[in-house]
């Protein structure tokens, strides 16, 4: 644990959560568009 840079992990966590948030919004947008256009 001492060899890991402590400043690196929160940045990766924020990028991962941001990626999953955008992916979730994209999937919801596709589902809603399929509902509306059907």
Swiss-Prot record:
Disulfide bonds: none annotated. One of its GO terms (biological process) is photosynthesis. InterPro entries: PSII_PsbL (IPR003372), PSII_PsbL_sf (IPR037266). One of its GO terms (cellular component) is chloroplast thylakoid membrane. It is found in: Plastid, Chloroplast thylakoid membrane. It comes from the Eukaryota. It is a single-pass membrane protein. Pfam families: PsbL. Its main location: plastid. The chain crosses the membrane at residues 17-37. Keywords: Chloroplast, Membrane, Photosynthesis, Photosystem II, Plastid, Reaction center, Thylakoid, Transmembrane, Transmembrane helix. One of the components of the core complex of photosystem II (PSII). PSII is a light-driven water:plastoquinone oxidoreductase that uses light energy to abstract electrons from H(2)O, generating O(2) and a proton gradient subsequently used for ATP formation. It consists of a core antenna complex that captures photons, and an electron transfer chain that converts photonic excitation into a charge separation. This subunit is found at the monomer-monomer interface and is required for correct PSII assembly and/or dimerization. Belongs to the PsbL family. PSII is composed of 1 copy each of membrane proteins PsbA, PsbB, PsbC, PsbD, PsbE, PsbF, PsbH, PsbI, PsbJ, PsbK, PsbL, PsbM, PsbT, PsbY, PsbZ, Psb30/Ycf12, at least 3 peripheral proteins of the oxygen-evolving complex and a large number of cofactors. It forms dimeric complexes. HAMAP family: PSII_PsbL. This is Photosystem II reaction center protein L. It comes from Cyanidium caldarium (Red alga). The lineage of its organism: Eukaryota, Rhodophyta, Bangiophyceae, Cyanidiales, Cyanidiaceae. The gene is psbL.
């Amino acid at each position: 644990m001492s060899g890991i840079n402590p400043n690196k992990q929160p940045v990766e966590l924020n990028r991962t959560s941001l990626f999953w948030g955008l992916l979730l919004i994209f999937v919801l947008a596709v589902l809603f568009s399929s509902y509306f256009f059907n």
